[in-house]
Design a protein with these regions (language model features):
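Short loop/turn segments immediately following beta-strands, especially the blade-tip
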Residues: 194-201, 278-285
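A short loop-to-beta-strand structural motif that recurs across blades of beta-propeller domains
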Residues: 54-56, 93-95, 148-151, 190-192, ...
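Blade-edge beta-strand/turn elements of extracellular beta-propeller
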Residues: 17-29, 60-69, 100-112, 149-168, ...
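Sec-dependent N-terminal signal peptides
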Residues: 3-12
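Short, solvent-exposed loop/turn segments at conserved positions within beta-propeller repeat blades
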Residues: 50-51, 89-90, 136-147, 186-189, ...
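Blade/loop signatures of beta-propeller domains
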Residues: 14-23, 42, 52, 144, ...
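Beta-propeller domains
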Residues: 45-67
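Beta-rich, blade/repeat-based domains predominating
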Residues: 23, 28-45, 69-88, 93, ...
Length: 288
């Protein structure tokens, strides 16, 4: 009964936010394919334009190019020390950049073979890193590994595989308490979930959500554990996978991140445009 009451409370909270009154604001447009939106505790936003090989930065002074020749940067995330961790899809590696701009390669090979094309990334508060390794577009012709992967990098830098998949994974995120790992399936249009232990090890996956409209890309959680999936719209689900509502968009979403000082602005990337929406909900702490 208590769990039903909690679900009803969460659903009522989201329902109170009338979708017809939500304002979707266009922030930046005329890009080629945006992805990898990430908010920094230092008060700025990063996002990738993958085919244009750039990472953009938006802060209090406006927008500028943060990095040229980004290696086909796709997913971005900041660790607890403020360092930027990036999935470089064209370079087929995961890197970490410190405040001085020094770049360190965290992963580029598994079992002696190059990664496919790292795509999206999530970082737990204790330093455990998780990323997806599909092979979209031209990367499919360069695929060396005999599977599509979900990978884990420990704080000591050790790389292991979480899941060997036949279909391509896409977005990835953590629950607010860091005990659950969520992965979207681009081909199957599902969300998988893995239990994580204190050492960062994952259980076998189970399918939590099916029948997503459009190709599911990035995924995030709010501080109540609700799931926000970038797809044809922004599809919002309860922690147990029940659909709550959708935020309609001018074009399909590729990724998303909670940002601003109160973590109540949802920044959304589509192929060509960066959007933002103010919400009553607040982003989950593991997204930072």
């Amino acid at each position: 009964m208590r769990s039903l009451a909690i679900f009803a409370l969460l659903a009522a909270s989201l329902a109170a936010e009338d979708p017809n009154t939500i304002k979707v604001e266009r922030v930046s447009s005329n890009h080629r394919f945006l992805d990898g939106v990430a908010w920094s505790h230092d008060g700025f936003l990063l996002f990738s334009d993958v085919p244009n090989n750039r990472i953009y930065k938006m802060g209090s002074k406006g927008m500028d190019v943060f990095r040229e020749k980004s290696g086909g940067a796709s997913g971005n995330a900041f660790d607890d020390k403020g360092r930027l961790v990036t999935c470089e899809s064209a370079n087929r590696r995961v890197t970490r950049t410190n405040a001085k701009g020094e770049v360190e390669v965290l992963a580029d090979k598994f079992e002696g073979k190059r990664l496919n094309a790292p795509n999206d990334i999530a970082i737990r508060k204790d330093g455990h890193i998780y990323f997806t390794d599909p092979a979209f577009g031209q990367a499919a012709d360069q695929k060396d590994l005999p599977f599509y992967g979900v990978f884990h990098i420990t704080p000591k830098g050790e790389l292991s595989v979480v899941s060997r998949l036949e279909k391509r994974p896409n977005g990835i995120t953590l629950s607010p308490n860091g005990k659950l790992l969520y992965v979207t399936g681009a081909d199957e249009r599902v969300v998988r979930v893995y239990d994580l232990d204190r050492q960062g090890n994952a259980s076998p996956d189970r399918v939590l959500i099916t029948g997503i409209t459009g190709v599911p890309g990035g995924i995030r959680t709010d501080d109540k554990g609700n799931l926000y999936v970038a797809c044809e719209s922004i599809a919002i689900y309860s922690p147990d996978g029940r659909p709550l509502r959708n935020i309609s968009l001018p074009e399909p979403a590729t990724n998303l991140a909670f940002g601003d000082g109160d973590l109540q602005t949802l920044y959304i990337t589509t192929r060509t445009t960066l959007l933002r929406v103010r919400l009553d909900a607040k982003g989950g702490v593991q997204e930072q």
